Protein backbone atom coordinates (compact mmCIF):
# COMPACT_ATOMS: atom_id res chain seq x y z
CA UNK A 1 0.00 0.00 0.00
CA UNK A 2 1.01 3.64 -0.29
CA UNK A 3 2.59 4.04 3.14
CA UNK A 4 4.71 0.90 2.73
CA UNK A 5 5.68 1.55 -0.88
CA UNK A 6 7.18 4.91 0.00
CA UNK A 7 9.62 3.36 2.46
CA UNK A 8 11.63 1.23 0.07
CA UNK A 9 12.94 1.30 -3.48
CA UNK A 10 12.62 -2.17 -4.92
CA UNK A 11 11.76 -3.64 -8.31
CA UNK A 12 9.02 -5.73 -6.72
CA UNK A 13 7.26 -2.80 -5.06
CA UNK A 14 4.87 -0.81 -7.22
CA UNK A 15 2.57 1.98 -6.16
CA UNK A 16 0.26 3.36 -8.80
CA UNK A 17 -0.74 7.02 -8.79
CA UNK A 18 -4.32 6.28 -7.90
CA UNK A 19 -4.94 9.90 -6.91
CA UNK A 20 -4.88 10.80 -10.58
CA UNK A 21 -7.78 8.50 -11.44
CA UNK A 22 -9.91 8.17 -8.30
CA UNK A 23 -10.59 10.40 -5.31
CA UNK A 24 -8.64 10.33 -2.05
CA UNK A 25 -11.47 8.70 -0.12
CA UNK A 26 -11.47 5.75 -2.51
CA UNK A 27 -7.68 5.46 -2.30
CA UNK A 28 -7.92 5.24 1.49
CA UNK A 29 -10.65 2.59 1.27
CA UNK A 30 -8.50 0.46 -1.06
CA UNK A 31 -5.41 0.93 1.09
CA UNK A 32 -7.29 0.03 4.28
CA UNK A 33 -8.87 -3.01 2.65
CA UNK A 34 -5.46 -4.28 1.57
CA UNK A 35 -4.09 -3.81 5.08
CA UNK A 36 -7.01 -5.65 6.71
CA UNK A 37 -7.08 -8.52 4.23
CA UNK A 38 -3.31 -8.92 4.58
CA UNK A 39 -3.74 -9.19 8.36
CA UNK A 40 -6.47 -11.79 7.81
CA UNK A 41 -4.15 -13.85 5.62
CA UNK A 42 -1.41 -13.73 8.23
CA UNK A 43 -3.87 -14.76 10.97
CA UNK A 44 -4.91 -17.77 8.90
CA UNK A 45 -1.29 -18.74 8.35
CA UNK A 46 -0.55 -18.42 12.06
CA UNK A 47 -3.35 -20.90 12.77
CA UNK A 48 -1.53 -23.38 10.52
CA UNK A 49 1.78 -22.67 12.24
CA UNK A 50 0.15 -23.63 15.55
CA UNK A 51 -0.67 -27.07 14.14
CA UNK A 52 3.06 -27.66 13.82
CA UNK A 53 3.77 -26.42 17.37
CA UNK A 54 5.93 -23.60 16.09
CA UNK A 55 6.17 -20.03 17.35
CA UNK A 56 3.57 -17.96 15.45
CA UNK A 57 6.03 -15.06 15.22
CA UNK A 58 7.87 -17.11 12.59
CA UNK A 59 5.21 -15.88 10.15
CA UNK A 60 7.12 -12.60 10.05
CA UNK A 61 9.94 -14.51 8.38
CA UNK A 62 7.59 -15.46 5.57
CA UNK A 63 5.58 -12.27 5.07
CA UNK A 64 7.92 -9.31 5.41
CA UNK A 65 5.56 -6.52 4.52
CA UNK A 66 7.96 -4.52 2.37
CA UNK A 67 8.89 -7.60 0.33
CA UNK A 68 5.64 -9.52 0.03
CA UNK A 69 4.35 -10.36 -3.44
CA UNK A 70 0.76 -10.29 -2.15
CA UNK A 71 -1.59 -8.74 -4.68
CA UNK A 72 -5.11 -7.32 -4.57
CA UNK A 73 -6.90 -7.51 -7.91
CA UNK A 74 -10.21 -6.34 -9.27
CA UNK A 75 -11.00 -8.73 -12.10
CA UNK A 76 -13.68 -7.43 -14.42
CA UNK A 77 -15.04 -9.92 -16.93
CA UNK A 78 -16.90 -8.31 -19.78
CA UNK A 79 -19.71 -10.08 -21.62
CA UNK A 80 -18.23 -13.33 -22.90
CA UNK A 81 -19.59 -14.30 -26.29
CA UNK A 82 -17.95 -17.70 -26.06
CA UNK A 83 -16.25 -19.82 -23.37
CA UNK A 84 -12.48 -19.73 -22.98
CA UNK A 85 -12.41 -23.50 -22.62
CA UNK A 86 -14.63 -26.57 -22.59
CA UNK A 87 -13.72 -28.95 -19.78
CA UNK A 88 -12.21 -32.20 -21.02
CA UNK A 89 -13.45 -33.89 -17.86
CA UNK A 90 -17.18 -33.17 -18.05
CA UNK A 91 -17.76 -31.00 -21.13
CA UNK A 92 -18.76 -27.92 -19.13
CA UNK A 93 -18.21 -24.51 -20.76
CA UNK A 94 -15.82 -22.39 -18.70
CA UNK A 95 -15.20 -18.68 -18.34
CA UNK A 96 -11.93 -19.33 -16.50
CA UNK A 97 -9.78 -22.42 -16.95
CA UNK A 98 -9.28 -25.08 -14.29
CA UNK A 99 -6.24 -24.20 -12.18
CA UNK A 100 -4.72 -23.84 -8.72
CA UNK A 101 -3.25 -20.59 -7.44
CA UNK A 102 0.44 -20.21 -6.71
CA UNK A 103 0.52 -18.58 -3.29
CA UNK A 104 -0.44 -19.42 0.29
CA UNK A 105 -4.09 -18.33 0.24
CA UNK A 106 -6.42 -16.64 -2.19
CA UNK A 107 -9.03 -14.67 -0.26
CA UNK A 108 -11.88 -13.93 -2.63
CA UNK A 109 -14.99 -11.80 -2.72
CA UNK A 110 -17.21 -12.82 -5.62
CA UNK A 111 -20.25 -10.97 -6.92
CA UNK A 112 -23.83 -12.22 -7.02
CA UNK A 113 -23.38 -13.93 -10.37
CA UNK A 114 -21.02 -16.45 -8.80
CA UNK A 115 -19.88 -19.25 -11.07
CA UNK A 116 -16.93 -20.37 -8.98
CA UNK A 117 -16.55 -24.13 -8.55
CA UNK A 118 -14.07 -26.14 -6.46
CA UNK A 119 -13.12 -29.76 -6.96
CA UNK A 120 -13.12 -32.59 -4.44
CA UNK A 121 -9.75 -34.25 -4.95
CA UNK A 122 -11.00 -37.69 -3.99
CA UNK A 123 -14.13 -38.10 -6.10
CA UNK A 124 -13.13 -35.45 -8.71
CA UNK A 125 -16.62 -33.91 -8.53
CA UNK A 126 -17.16 -30.17 -8.86
CA UNK A 127 -19.16 -28.14 -6.34
CA UNK A 128 -20.62 -24.65 -6.65
CA UNK A 129 -19.40 -21.99 -4.24
CA UNK A 130 -22.51 -19.94 -3.42
CA UNK A 131 -22.44 -16.16 -3.14
CA UNK A 132 -22.62 -14.80 0.39
CA UNK A 133 -22.28 -11.05 0.82
CA UNK A 134 -21.09 -11.56 4.41
CA UNK A 135 -18.43 -14.13 3.62
CA UNK A 136 -15.09 -14.44 1.87
CA UNK A 137 -13.92 -17.54 0.02
CA UNK A 138 -10.48 -18.87 0.98
CA UNK A 139 -8.64 -21.13 -1.45
CA UNK A 140 -5.38 -22.78 -0.48
CA UNK A 141 -2.49 -22.42 -2.92
CA UNK A 142 0.48 -24.32 -4.28
CA UNK A 143 2.97 -22.64 -1.92
CA UNK A 144 1.00 -23.78 1.13
CA UNK A 145 0.80 -27.32 -0.24
CA UNK A 146 4.57 -27.29 -0.70
CA UNK A 147 5.39 -25.96 2.78
CA UNK A 148 3.01 -28.43 4.48
CA UNK A 149 4.28 -31.36 2.40
CA UNK A 150 0.84 -31.89 0.91
CA UNK A 151 -1.18 -31.78 4.13
CA UNK A 152 -3.05 -28.74 2.83
CA UNK A 153 -3.73 -29.35 -0.85
CA UNK A 154 -3.98 -26.51 -3.34
CA UNK A 155 -7.61 -25.89 -4.25
CA UNK A 156 -8.42 -26.91 -7.81
CA UNK A 157 -11.03 -24.44 -9.07
CA UNK A 158 -12.66 -23.03 -12.17
CA UNK A 159 -15.36 -20.54 -13.19
CA UNK A 160 -18.39 -21.44 -15.27
CA UNK A 161 -19.05 -19.57 -18.50
CA UNK A 162 -21.52 -16.74 -18.04
CA UNK A 163 -22.54 -14.44 -20.87
CA UNK A 164 -23.18 -11.63 -18.40
CA UNK A 165 -20.42 -9.37 -17.15
CA UNK A 166 -19.16 -9.99 -13.62
CA UNK A 167 -16.47 -8.96 -11.17
CA UNK A 168 -14.38 -10.83 -8.63
CA UNK A 169 -11.99 -9.35 -6.08
CA UNK A 170 -9.23 -11.83 -5.19
CA UNK A 171 -6.41 -11.13 -2.76
CA UNK A 172 -3.41 -13.35 -3.41
CA UNK A 173 -1.60 -13.78 -0.09
CA UNK A 174 1.99 -14.58 -0.97
CA UNK A 175 5.38 -14.72 0.79
CA UNK A 176 8.22 -12.25 0.50
CA UNK A 177 10.00 -12.60 -2.83
CA UNK A 178 13.24 -13.68 -1.11
CA UNK A 179 11.71 -16.15 1.38
CA UNK A 180 13.33 -19.58 1.13
CA UNK A 181 10.69 -22.18 0.25
CA UNK A 182 12.09 -24.88 2.50
CA UNK A 183 9.97 -27.86 3.52
CA UNK A 184 11.78 -27.78 6.84
CA UNK A 185 10.20 -24.41 7.69
CA UNK A 186 7.11 -26.06 9.20
CA UNK A 187 8.28 -29.64 9.44
CA UNK A 188 11.74 -29.26 10.97
CA UNK A 189 13.12 -28.02 14.25
CA UNK A 190 14.86 -25.17 12.47
CA UNK A 191 14.22 -23.32 9.25
CA UNK A 192 16.93 -24.12 6.71
CA UNK A 193 17.99 -22.04 3.74
CA UNK A 194 17.90 -24.98 1.37
CA UNK A 195 15.00 -24.09 -0.91
CA UNK A 196 14.27 -21.83 -3.85
CA UNK A 197 13.44 -18.24 -3.06
CA UNK A 198 9.73 -17.60 -3.55
CA UNK A 199 10.31 -15.47 -6.64
CA UNK A 200 11.73 -18.49 -8.49
CA UNK A 201 9.10 -20.82 -7.03
CA UNK A 202 6.41 -18.46 -8.32
CA UNK A 203 7.98 -18.26 -11.78
CA UNK A 204 7.98 -22.05 -12.03
CA UNK A 205 4.37 -22.19 -10.86
CA UNK A 206 3.18 -19.58 -13.34
CA UNK A 207 4.65 -21.53 -16.24
CA UNK A 208 2.12 -24.27 -15.48
CA UNK A 209 -0.80 -21.93 -16.25
CA UNK A 210 -2.51 -22.47 -19.57
CA UNK A 211 -2.10 -18.79 -20.47
CA UNK A 212 1.69 -19.21 -20.40
CA UNK A 213 1.57 -22.32 -22.55
CA UNK A 214 -0.39 -20.84 -25.44
What are these regions (language model features)?
Residues 1-214:
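Peripheral, non-catalytic segments flanking oxidoreductase cores
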Amino acid sequence: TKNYAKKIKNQYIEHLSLNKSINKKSVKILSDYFDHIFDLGESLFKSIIKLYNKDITSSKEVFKRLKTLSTLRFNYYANQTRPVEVSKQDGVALGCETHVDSGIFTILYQDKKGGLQVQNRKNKKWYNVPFNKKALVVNTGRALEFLTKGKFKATNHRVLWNKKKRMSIPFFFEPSYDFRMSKSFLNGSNSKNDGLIYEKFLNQSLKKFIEYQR
